[in-house]
Amino acid sequence: MKSFIINLSKISTSANTASNLKKQLEEFKMPVELFEGTYGNDAVEMMEKENRTWHPFGIKGPDVIPDPAARPNLKGNTPGVKGCFYSHFRLWQKCVELNEPIIIWEDDIVLTRPYIPIEWTDVLILALGHPAKTEKYRHYLENPMGIPKAKPYFQSSMPGCCGYALKPHAAKKLIDTYHNTFLPADNAINQHHVIIEIHSHVMGIALIKKDGKKSLTRTSYWNKL
């Protein structure tokens, strides 16, 4: 299964972490490519040209998340979030174009083990991200037990999008859902639209959780250029 690492090559920190992740995946004999992400300021311009608006509902259902135009300081209404969404959206398109499952990585991941092939339905979490949403699954990384398989994931949306596998039919669902709208990428992938599962032998962990480093959308990576 092909892997794609979202990488912002004009930002040295992103380029370095992406290069390190690529080396880890190559050591595991996994096909991997660097994928140039969408910079935040570019995403803002693209959304204006496309008249792309905030999706009418989020992880808790219709009319729960307000339109960011009415709240300029809303967390989701930032160049970083928009650039991140576009980067993932373009890889959903790549998945459909290839017509095969792919793995999508953000660059700030440290891996523990290679991918162990299993069956899953739509979306499969492969790396631990948001601490509050993944703490109960920590043993899948540190002390996995039993036969590797897809396990239920009980949160409404992704715990960040630092590492996940995606099937073409699920990618198409997401593309159709957000063809002219957007949400933060992790909220966009939610169980109103796709089934989210987690690998019982998780591959890695985001640096935000391992070393206390900030995630991509909380740094200037996405909107610096």
Question: What role is predicted for each listed range?
Answer:
Residues 1-105, 109-225:
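An acidic/histidine-cluster motif and surrounding catalytic segment
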